[in-house]
Amino acid sequence: MADETTTDTPDVQDEDAPDEDAPQTPDDTASDSTGEAAAADTDADAPDENAPDEDAPDAAPQDKDDGDDAPEESSSEEETSHRVTIEELLKAGAHFGHLTSRWNPRMEKYIFMERNNIHIIDLMQSQVLLDEAAEAAKRFARRGKKILFAGTKKQAEDIVREHAEECGMPHMVDRWLGGTMTNFQTIRKSIRRMEEIERMDRDGTLDKLKKKEKLMRLREHEKLEETLGGIRDMANLPSAIYIVDVQREDIAVSEANNLGIPIIAMVDTNGNPKNIDYPIPVNDDALSSIELVTSTLTDAVQEGLQERRMKKEEKKKAAA
């Protein structure tokens, strides 16, 4: 089925990669702040066909489910409330899309209007779809499954790393290595090589090497750590993947699709929502927008993990 903007005032987004389905023109238009009011007033409902089936099975050949968790009914509170308000989305600049000349036609149903050659995203749909993505992330965590966080664009790196580590999930933020999931065993060999160099350093083996050879080993380790350090503890394929920018991380999207791994992703107006299980139509370039979406998903993961811990404690008490 998947650069740089200011943090405070949402602006027209720089393109990381050209969209294959749309013509390209230079980004030279400033966003009109009146788009905020227009996006806030919309009463469009999220199309039912975009909402993923909550009861759909999680993709198989990844983390093993220990059978601890059974499907649960959504609470009435979850059904009637939203994790993020329209005002919060507006403040984060989540409604600002790209230049109309750079859009992907498949995003048309998520676009509220056009203003000054900029597409404005329908935040009513963004709000609902973010809720659905968060509930999916919560379910994965509650069942003891791993979600790989992926965001290699500069403004996403620190945010993705911080939140992934906060909830104990693997992450890739330096660059996406082709075959990270489809050639996972080779990736694991590289991780074992990194760990081998670390052992050599601890036991003094590196000190016995010639200075030049030792330096080469240390540089090799540094490179491996930068690229693979975030997934060193990921012993199996993830059960799901969260992607910040499907346009940039197109290889990750392709690999997940090939393996049947569910995708949760931020999709901007230049992106392709096709084959994304849980698309979140939002600005994927603004720091504030990336932070809002990623922190919301992280909170959901932590809720799932907490419910899992509580359930295990209840079982222990019942067995005592």
UniProtKB/Swiss-Prot annotation:
Chain spans, region Disordered: 1-83
Keyword RNA-binding in annotation: no
UniProt keyword list: Ribonucleoprotein, Ribosomal protein
CDD domains: RPS2
A GO molecular-function descriptor: structural constituent of ribosome
Regions of compositional bias (Low complexity) in chain numbering: 27-41
GO cellular component, one term: cytosolic small ribosomal subunit
Compositional bias (Acidic residues): 1-22, 42-57, 65-78
InterPro entries assigned to the protein according to its UniProt record, in alphabetical order: Ribosomal_uS2, Ribosomal_uS2_bac/mit/plastid, Ribosomal_uS2_CS, Ribosomal_uS2_flav_dom_sf
Domain of life: Bacteria
GO biological process: translation
Family statement drawn from the similarity comment of this UniProt entry: Belongs to the universal ribosomal protein uS2 family.
HAMAP family (UniProt xref): Ribosomal_uS2_B (MF_00291_B)
NCBIfam families on file: rpsB_bact
Protein name: Small ribosomal subunit protein uS2
Native organism: Salinibacter ruber (strain DSM 13855 / M31)
Gene: rpsB
